[in-house]
Amino acid sequence: MMDLELPPPGLQSQQDMDLIDILWRQDIDLGVSREVFDFSQRQKDYELEKQKKLEKERQEQLQKEQEKAFFAQLQLDEETGEFLPIQPAQHIQTDTSGSVSYSQVAHIPKQDALYFEDCMQLLAETFPFVDDHEVSSPTFQSLALDIPSHVESSVFTTPDQAQSLDSSLETAMTDLSSIQQDMEQVWQELFSIPELQCLNTENKQQAETTTVPSPEATLTEMDSNYHFYSSIPSLEKEVDSCSPHFLHGFEDSFSSILSTDDASQLNSLDSNPTLNTDFGDEFYSAFLAEPSGGGSMPSSAAISQSLSELLGGPIEGCDLSLCKAFNQKHTEGTVEFNDSDSGISLNTSPSRASPEHSVESSIYGDPPPGFSDSEMEELDSAPGSVKQNGPKAQPTHSSGDTVQPLSPAQGHSAAVHESQCENTTKKEVPVSPGHQKVPFTKDKHSSRLEAHLTRDELRAKALHIPFPVEKIINLPVDDFNEMMSKEQFNEAQLALIRDIRRRGKNKVAAQNCRKRKLENIVELEQDLGHLKDEREKLLREKGENDRNLHLLKRKLSTLYLEVFSMLRDEDGKPYSPSEYSLQQTRDGNVFLVPKSKKPDTKKN
């Protein structure tokens, strides 16, 4: 045996390389890349993906460790569910000497940016809130403890005690100044935070309106400030027994706000007996006491109780109609204010929000749907005629028709109030807000005639065109040219006449077009109805013909069977229907034709 030497697997011959290149070019033409057949390239890609996966896992593990270390420095807030940084315990150094004690602020290193929660905690630790019944500063407590009880009076003060008192006061003043500096520094640090910039403006406004009291004033007013909250009930008790001068102070401040016109109106209120006696007496007549001889004022408790009962109950519409202030009969005696939106006054200069505009809208309300655009413009151009025709739509009633309102204190039942509400009639709405009565007009008839003229008629009348608008629109061309040749017109009149005739002809053409469309629609509807009737008629005839045809077929089959049963062969036997059939020719002859191919036939 001859041993064959095989090439090592790592080495490839030139023929194999050429074959690989040929196959690769074919695969390239088919869309396959060379890396599919290259094992080393695939191995490199696999190792690269493996390294990327390991790097990604390492990054995730590092991120988890960082998060774990971060959350270890935080604590969970049970109220908000947020993670807050753990603050170290702040030790407050206090001076226990017999002079003055003050809480020192713990030093906190300044960071680039502070959290809002850190600042609030710093503020709470630096300036702890005290109760209402505690002294506002520890300095005052120590100062009050240092002063003996027998030295409180200036009569028994010795020179040594006075010197010690002066030294303690100087120490307190220096401590207060240092406290103020520390407070200002802390506030500046707080307001340097971006989240608290919105509070800076409020702090400035408060700094402008408030002042810092001096230490001497604080020491002298300490006792009064200490008992301020506890003295509120006594202050409430003294409100009832305050002097009338205190109450007049509010009236003076109110009168200083008003203008001179309003002040004169207020003075007229005091001098007007109708307003003082009639206005609102139905509302609070239950708790207004009669003026006695001693001139005693009703107690504030009774007034507040009656007022709460009045405001607690609902106000009915009938009660408003019974009130003299809401009754139009007493409008002459009431004083009206400028710019009133109460709905009572209709005089003087009202604002845009006043109910006068709603009154005007009700007088000159929306026109009937039959009005055209030209009539609407004509109504807008002639408001005087509309104003004169406005009260015509309102029914007039005599003074005897109105029911005199009665106060509810006289014991009337609810049914009487309802009947009074139904019988209460409306008065005539005035034409303008400044008039209480409808003005008399002499040219009412002519204004009514002008109110019904169209815009073209008004324009033709203004330009003195001698013939009516209907003739301009409806005349034929020859007659219109002849009529125009008889008169002399300027450019404005000619332009108006041409415009009126053009728009009139367009309007007539549009009407004729709509008319033709309607006629075509009606004609189509009629044709559709006729076609439906004819279709129903044909359907009925078809059904009848089908029934007749079915009856004839049945008769024919009966006759066929009868004739076929009468036929006999040579032996006298009847023919089988499965083997023979009858057929008729055009001349009326009937033949017995076998269904199978047989030459013999018989003639009947």
From Swiss-Prot:
Primary subcellular site in the record, as a coarse category: cytoplasm
Region (Mediates interaction with CHD6 and is necessary to activate transcription): 590-595
DNA damage found in the keyword field: no
Domain bZIP: 496-559
InterPro entries for the chain: bZIP, bZIP_Maf, bZIP_sf, NFE2-like, TF_DNA-bd_sf
UniProt region (Disordered), positions on chain: 334-447, 570-604
Domain of life the protein comes from: Eukaryota
UniProt KW keywords: Acetylation, Activator, Cytoplasm, DNA-binding, Glycation, Glycoprotein, Nucleus, Phosphoprotein, Transcription, Transcription regulation, Ubl conjugation
Subunit structure: Heterodimer; heterodimerizes with small Maf proteins. Interacts (via the bZIP domain) with MAFG and MAFK; required for binding to antioxidant response elements (AREs) on DNA. Interacts with KEAP1; the interaction is direct and promotes ubiquitination by the BCR(KEAP1) E3 ubiquitin ligase complex. Forms a ternary complex with PGAM5 and KEAP1. Interacts with EEF1D at heat shock promoter elements (HSE). Interacts via its leucine-zipper domain with the coiled-coil domain of PMF1. Interacts with CHD6; involved in activation of the transcription.
Domains as described in the record: The ETGE motif, and to a lower extent the DLG motif, mediate interaction with KEAP1.
Protein name: Nuclear factor erythroid 2-related factor 2
Organism encoding this protein: Rattus norvegicus
